[in-house]
Amino acid sequence: MYRAGAVLLRGATRTRLLAAASAHQSFATFSQRNQSILMMKSMELAGNSGERRFYSTHDDPIAVDDSLELYKDLGGMSPIQVPADMPNVPMLAINRYPLFPGFIKKVDIVKDDNLKALIRRQLSLKQPYAGVFVKRDDENKEETITSLSEVYPTGSFVQIIEVRDQGSVLELVLSAHRRIRALEPIDEITPKNETPLNGRRARGKRAASATSPLTPPPSPPPLAPSVASVAPEISATEEKEEKTTPPSATGEKQKKGIIMVRTENVVAEPVPKNNETKATMMAIVQTIRDVVQFNQLFGQQINLLLHPSQNVIDNPVYLCDLVATLVQSAETKDLQEMMDEIDVSKRLKIALLLIQKEKAVAKLKYDINKDVEKKVQDHHRKYLLNEQLKVIKKELGIEKDEKTTIIEKIDERIKTLAVPEYALKVINEEKTKLQFLDPHSSEFSVTRNYLEWLTSVPWGLTSPENRRLSVAKKALDEGHYGMKDVKERIMEFIAVNLLRKSIGGKILCFHGPPGVGKTSIAKSIATALNREYFRFSVGGMTDVAEIKGHRRTYVGAMPGKMIQCMKKVKTENPLVLIDEVDKIGGAGFHGDPASALLELLDPEQNANFNDHFLDVPVDLSRVLFICTANEISKIPGPLRDRMEMIDVSGYLAEEKVEIAHQHLIPQLRKDTSLATEQLKIEDSALEELIKHYCRESGVRNLQQHIERIFRKAALQIAEQQNEDEEPAEKATTAITENSEAEPITSTSSADCLKSSAEQIVVCTENLQKFVGRPKFTSDRMYEVTPPGVIMGLAWTAMGGSALYIETVLKRPVDLTNDKDGSIETTGNLGDVMKESVRTALTVAKGILAREQPDNKFFDKAHIHIHVPEGATPKDGPSAGVTLVSSLLSLALDRPVVQDMAMTGEISLTGKVLPVGGIREKVIAARRVGAKRVFLPNENRRDFDDLPEFMKSELDIRFVSHYDELYEHLFQ
């Protein structure tokens, strides 16, 4: 692989180079040229990163035959003349930039051993010449080619003026003399008698040197032991005598690569001497000078080369080669076009175009660098001025340093706070530490951040709490309908604080189905108590640091949610709502957040809550914590034990209608600007909406459907207004165009007002136009239940619902079969419910054996029990009595009393045990139209707490044993 660099030499008066070692050369000139050779050898030749060009700093060209260190077998410093015609030369294929005559390039041969051997043999034969050609593909990194089509046909005949042979790498410094054209590849043929060119003349040369009247100075010592410099010179006569015999075998070498090629010299056409040529050359010279202004690195050398005394204007060929070597932004094909061209006029035009492009690129680069440098200098200047200004202000006492400002700010905060002694001690220690830290250090930022958080805690600050019960009751009733238990508990809380004459905290948990107002009631409570409100959700939280903060040694450390809350509300007695506490993430890599809440929600511990970031106890005993949850069974036991549980049940249809009238519809009228005169929703439409569209326990879905009605009505009114405005606009336009038309009357305007004032009434007949088809077409799955089908009552996170139990025979009962019967369950049942099935089967067998001893139904029957809606998981023990009734109904082949529902857990002896969710189940029974409901006797107290309107229209039967229910099962 080649690594190339270039050194610029003058090509004019090249014939003077042949006299470098002659006796008539002065010693001063010889020493000067030796110095130039030393300078050239000391240059660091460029690598793969691109070409670096160096220029001579003296007028005379560097003599390539002055003091060059040759191979040891080359003999003395006998000059070798460059042959005018040498057709067979080794081929060197390079990348990117062509090598033009009069210039130098460094080439390394690394991989190809055959090419290395050929170059070494040529050097030993004192034939240090080669042909350099540019590859067409810049990505081709091979050192040899397999076909001449891979390179451009025109290249340069070069002389190897310096060699560094390092074994694995052969470093060559090439000096180009003329342009050549590659004709065909040839095979390398080693002559039988390899005699050095100067071998036969060595003795004669030494004799001539001895008899010369002027002895030239001795050659200088070699520059480096590994450097071999070759600058052979032979006369034209000797070159003719020693012509190389052309090889007999030609052709492209596909496997080993082309390393030797037959060439011919490229002869340029005569230079036209006219004004156009001179003008073009002068334009080129001037453009080169302009380019040098933007790149001062080689400005002095180029200006010397372009000096009028050098007569560059008389050598257009060299000027074109100079331009091709100077340009750095040109493409390979553009440079090769100049190499191929033999018409000097065209070459000058190509050179002018290239140097003008280079000028544009150089100017753009210069402008960019200048802008960047200006910005850097301006920034540096501003920085220095700011630093000087700070020092001046500090000396004059106008401004204090950053540390003093921070400490004074902290002291101002402390004056308004009642900071405890232990916290004040930590603050003073950190202030002292801050004074000795460098403001630019990371520890300074950590300490300052810690002090800011520590002084942001509202130590001893509390907001005045409302203790007027009437005001609190009014605030709660205005925001929410119903929720009797919640409102009573808050009133009790206010009463206790009133009697204690102090501000206290509490930990409450509102649990119930979604959409019943658990989260919104918390904000109303904060308003009623005149406390600051802060909410954060722990649903899906998996990191303990969200609650207790990070260690402040961590990068980007922050305190937990409670400290952030205290900083925001600026009081020690806010109302903090912890939402979705039943959906908190489990224990993981970052700890267990549920366990972290234990300290926060424990009344005995939160008076000294320790955040990891502050590492100072903070009093949270005055905070009123309110948690919300849908299912309390998912809350960890220790955490549930620390909270006071308050059930927020679902709403009946009547309650939903009242909520819609008192809260939902007024709020939507305010949001949509639709007055009562524009839209009216009848009660029958609301009841239909609740019954067939929104059966959930909450009112969130009901709110969405009512909002949809308002949007449809708003669209209808807006369209009507646009239709009424368009005729009026057209009439106004017509009057403007025709001034003689009759004046417009106010009839259309009155009609528009009348149309816009028409009221939209939503009733049961047009409800589907606004909200679509009903989602629930029937209240119950069975209007008449067959044998084996019983309606039970279930309680889910969405509220109460009817749960049917279906029991059928898989095949007819064969009493003669010796095999026992079986039972199968489907419907996505949980483990507890599957156990209830087995328990119910045992109880049913006992009752059937008692009532009909001869009935062997359960011994031989293959029974299948299914609970509909199999996509919904079902679990729990409350379906025990329903399962027993279903099995007995199937065994006796008798349907139970219609419009009957039941719930309760069954024991193995038939005892009916209490269950939860009585309110939700009673609501579900009313919704599906059940008339008789069986409840466990121990749930009587829960039923008594229900409002009277909820108990009406229901025949409630309380049972303690299943026998009591069995007596009324088939009546």
UniProtKB/Swiss-Prot annotation:
Binding site for ATP: 512-519
Gene3D superfamilies to which the protein is assigned, alphabetical: 1.10.8.60, 1.20.5.5270, 1.20.58.1480, 3.30.230.10, LON domain-like, P-loop containing nucleotide triphosphate hydrolases
GO biological process: cellular response to oxidative stress; chaperone-mediated protein complex assembly; IRE1-mediated unfolded protein response; mitochondrion organization; oxidation-dependent protein catabolic process; protein catabolic process; protein quality control for misfolded or incompletely synthesized proteins
PROSITE patterns: LON_N, LON_PROTEOLYTIC, LON_SER
Region (Disordered), start-end ranges: 190-255, 718-749
Cellular compartments annotated: Mitochondrion matrix
GO CC, one annotated term: mitochondrial matrix
Family of the protein in this entry: Belongs to the peptidase S16 family.
Originating species: Caenorhabditis elegans
Transit peptide: 1-55
Keywords annotated in UniProt: ATP-binding, DNA-binding, Hydrolase, Mitochondrion, Nucleotide-binding, Protease, Serine protease, Transit peptide
Name of encoding gene: lonp-1
Protein name: Lon protease homolog, mitochondrial
